[in-house]
Regions:
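A short glycine/serine-rich beta->alpha loop
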Residues: 1-9
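Transmembrane helix-loop junctions at the membrane interface of multipass transporters and ion channels
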Residues: 82-83
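Short Ser/Thr-interspersed hydrophobic loop/turn segments at strand-loop and sheet-helix junctions
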Residues: 16-24
Length: 319
């Protein structure tokens, strides 16, 4: 056996006795590793008890009833090895929001996959960027799991998921909606990247949220992969992460964020058109992403200048 999981209160009892008896009877260690967890604590700082009052703290069973089994697993998985964790509604709410966003983002991506046959295409820059982000996350995820750091692994997946939703989907969605404007190849590139990363995310999240990931997987991906369950499928390994384009893609996201921030600060709708934006000191990657930047920010003209990095909005389209 490779692993013995238990809490820190069992180190000098269960762990010691098992090791001693195994050496005595079999002259070998019973397992290679021990995974030490902490306790779930009530609001008073005491270990949760089945028989004693927990001071009104939400119990795991109540959490299951209120938030679902997936959210309860999410909360439990967030704990660091060997450390106690307070049971707070805030953490369960975070898990519930993640589950809702996962469902909605999946519905969006899957809505563009009807009749779609997955195939590798020459990716547009931001599509290649999100694939590289996935490769980086996958590498960090597997490294954390090898150390039994379930919480760190989950944190890596969450960062990618919110990047995927808040940045990538927002930037690429116009190419999915309007192939007649941006071209079929631009749509196919976005289809490949969005569906591939979503599938990878579902698989990485499946050990934390097994029910909702299975539900989404069965909708489309089970047929594509010819697999009965996400839990019998393999993780999606897209190859070695090289890291050459992640910083450039992040630069695009930062520019989009600045322009959207300008609109918000000036009480403008995100759909409000801009006559011209001047981007100074950007990379060639940003220039190659002009089609996406114009689309997501509704810009008529982008001018590029040399010099210190800066983004300047020169005019707003009159309504």
């Amino acid at each position: 056996m490779d692993l013995r999981p238990n809490a820190h209160d069992n180190i000098r009892v269960w762990d010691f006795y098992t090791i001693a008896k195994s050496l005595l009877h079999f002259n070998k260690l019973p397992w290679r590793d021990v995974m030490i967890s902490g306790w779930g604590l009530s609001a008073t700082g005491n270990k949760l008890s089945k028989s004693k009052s927990n001071g009104g703290t939400l119990t795991p069973h109540q959490a299951y009833e209120k938030y679902s089994a997936d959210v309860t697993r999410y909360w439990a998985s967030n704990a660091s090895l060997g450390k106690d964790v307070y049971i707070k509604d805030e953490e369960f709410n975070n898990g519930f929001k993640l589950m809702q966003k996962l469902w909605n983002a999946s519905r969006f991506v899957l809505s563009f996959l009807e009749g779609y046959t997955p195939k590798e295409v020459e990716l547009l820059p931001m599509d290649a960027w999100i694939i590289s982000c996935y490769k980086q996350t996958y590498s960090r995820f597997m490294s954390a799991l090898e150390k039994y750091e379930m919480g760190l692994a989950l944190n890596e997946v969450e960062k990618l998921f919110w990047n995927f939703c808040d940045n990538y989907i927002e930037i690429a969605k116009n190419r999915l909606y309007k192939p007649e404007v941006y071209g079929e190849h631009a749509k196919e590139s976005a289809q490949y990247a969005s569906s591939t990363v979503l599938l990878g995310l579902l698989k990485l999240l499946s050990i934390y949220m097994p029910h909702i990931t299975e539900e989404i997987y069965q909708d489309t991906f089970a047929k594509i992969e010819d697999c009965t369950s996400i839990h019998t499928s393999k993780y999606l390994d897209l190859g070695e992460y090289t890291g050459h384009d992640i910083a450039f893609g992040n630069e695009v996201c930062e520019i989009v964020s600045i322009i959207r921030g300008y609109k918000s600060q000036n009480n403008l709708s995100l759909k409000t058109g801009l006559t011209e934006v001047v981007i100074t000191g950007c990379s060639q990657f940003v220039k190659d992403c002009e089609i996406d930047i114009k689309a997501v920010c509704n810009i008529q003209k982008i001018t590029y200048l040399e010099g210190e990095k800066n983004v300047e909005i020169l005019g707003v389209v009159a309504e």
